[in-house]
Amino acid sequence: MKNVVIAGYARSPFTFAGKGALKKVRPDQLAADVVKGLLTRTGVDPEDIEDLILGCAFPEAEQGLNMARLVGFLADLPLSVGGVTVNRFCGSSMYAIHMAAGAVRMNAGEVFICAGVESMTRVPIMGYNPMPHPGLYERYPEAYIAMGETAENVATKYQITREAQEAFAVESQRRAAAAQAAGKLDDEIVAIASDDGPVDKDGCIRPESTAQALAELKPAFDESGTVTAGTSSPLTDGA
């Protein structure tokens, strides 16, 4: 079997949903801009690309239809480049890589673009009109469990204390801020055009976070739980 390699990587900045610098940018355009930036950086011939595999957790509205194909058009890829949108919730873009790697090893193509995009501003969690199956919800409500509740379950199962979560969160923010200040994230970010000018910096880093401040927050998902807004991933827009 062929060996599989990741030959290049690019991303947009990640900014807060609803109030960040990317809130007015459509997700399909956001993904297309990143694809364009990736091709410019790598010098890959678009004619060699077999498929664009795009992960998206809530593929509806501006993220709807087969968004991967539409992103290909917006990124000026040749018509010969296919497009498929993958939904495995939080693992969607990771699974796009798994799919491409399997295809390469099976000789079903040599060059793939694996991507992911989510605008939590433009398409809210659970989408615009969630309609759980009544029978399934009654019999197995866990099928519709939210990630925050899952985090509580994981913390309980593996005995991860609130203090340990908050220490990890503070260190994560510190490292992210240090990396940004040192310019270590610059090479991977594609600047995105917005109404207020180019967006080229992550907007979700909070270096002012402290263990003392996080300890004052109320649990976000279970009133007797340990997970708070300070130890949860923020709602973001990005690709």
Named regions from a protein language model:
Residues 17-19, 64-65, 122-128, 203:
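Short acidic, glycine/serine/threonine-rich loops at helix termini
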Residues 10-13, 24-33, 41, 164-239:
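N-terminal extracellular/periplasmic Venus flytrap/periplasmic-binding protein-like
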Residues 105-158:
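Flexible glycine-/small-residue-enriched beta->alpha junction loops
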Residues 86-117, 155-185, 238:
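Active-site-proximal alpha-helical scaffold in enzymes
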Residues 7-9, 112-118, 193:
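Short beta-strand segments
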Residues 56-110, 141-149, 208-234:
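Conserved catalytic cysteine-centered active-site region
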